[in-house]
A protein has these predicted regions:
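Extended low-complexity, serine/threonine- and proline-enriched intrinsically disordered segments
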Residues: 1-22
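Conserved positions within compact, well-structured domain cores
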Residues: 15-16, 22-324
Length: 324
């Protein structure tokens, strides 16, 4: 907005509404104002509701001569945690990546509803609840989730296509995410997995260092589920791994969980079900993968190929204004 010197711009909200709009004077000129909308981490009201505010132009001297402009948006939110400079989503993607209704929403976070972190929730939730979160992977550019199924005793992804020729990691980072979110970059994954202190042995509790922010120590804790079943098959030793930085103790750990990648018609069992392959934004096609056996499970740089299925974990796209 560029206002006459006699005018001012203000914002009005209905009672109880968050102050989600910010007015920023530009170039030191109080009459040249940029209006931006903000984001609230873990907003428990962000269920797609209509969020409204009024921009008011009026005379500075007495508030008369009001002009009102109503601004409306749909307020959606996903649960997040702050880790090494990134607002990571807590949960893997589910269903249609573009559809908020398919995702775990910050207004309906199952872990928060029972007063737990996600790491603790995955220990105590029912096998059915665990499987519902764990079973989703993606392939190509459709953004439509593939679900783990029992195919006559073979655990595989329903709808797997061995002829897929699109490398997910080379796609635009916003293509496979809902509005306001995106696929984290290789550099952002490196802040967590690119160890400068040796191999990250994921099957054990421990710690490792990365070079992010000079020198960052990341603590690791792991747990297993042995009570999950799909059809006739028992899915034993399903690992989920908590990682946290002591510099961010106000935020809960990030938790890695999910099914092994599938790269042919033989399914997702590779001696176990924990060879997770992550969707990473990398024009070079790089990525991160949990490789090895359950006696030696570790993270490696591996972008894999076009036929491989991947777990999707969103991050919040950068924003200029965060409100509480």
């Amino acid at each position: 907005f560029v206002l006459p010197v006699s005018k001012e711009l203000s914002v009005e909200y209905e009672a109880g509404e968050d102050e989600w709009i910010k007015l920023l004077p530009q170039g030191g000129n109080p009459n040249r104002i940029r209006v931006i909308a903000g984001w609230k981490p873990n907003d428990t009201t962000a269920n797609g509701r209509r969020q409204e505010a009024k921009l008011i132009i009026s005379n500075k001297i007495d508030g008369s001569g009001r002009e009102e402009y109503t601004v409306v948006r749909r307020n959606w939110g996903l649960p997040v945690t702050y880790f090494n400079g990134v607002w990571w989503c807590k949960y893997n993607a589910k269903g249609n990546v573009k559809d908020f209704n398919d995702q775990v929403l910050s207004s309906d976070d199952p872990a928060v509803k029972v007063g737990k972190t996600l790491f603790d929730y995955l220990q105590t939730c029912t096998p059915e609840e665990f499987f519902e979160l764990w079973k989703w992977e993606y392939q190509g550019d459709s953004g439509l989730g593939l679900q783990v199924i029992d195919d006559n005793g073979v655990v595989k992804l329903d709808g797997y296509d061995h002829n897929t020729s699109i490398h997910m990691n080379k796609l635009d980072p916003r293509l496979l995410a809902p509005d306001g979110f995106e696929i984290p970059s290789m550099e952002e994954y490196n802040r967590i997995f690119s160890s400068i202190s040796g191999t990250i042995w994921l099957m054990w509790d421990g710690s490792h260092k990365t070079s992010w922010n000079g020198d960052t120590t990341i603590q690791r804790r792991q747990r297993r589920r042995n009570d999950v079943k799909i059809g006739t098959v028992e899915l034993n030793d399903l690992i989920y791994i908590s990682m946290y930085n002591n510099d961010h103790i106000d935020y809960e750990p990030i938790v890695w969980y999910g099914a092994s990648a599938q790269w042919n018609n033989d399914g997702i069992y590779h001696g176990h079900y924990n060879n997770m392959l992550f969707t990473v934004y990398s024009p070079k096609g790089e990525g991160w993968y949990f490789t090895g056996s359950m006696k030696g499970l570790y993270s490696v740089v591996n972008g894999a190929g076009t036929k491989d299925t991947r777990i999707i974990r969103f991050k919040k796209s950068d924003v200029e204004y965060i409100y509480e």
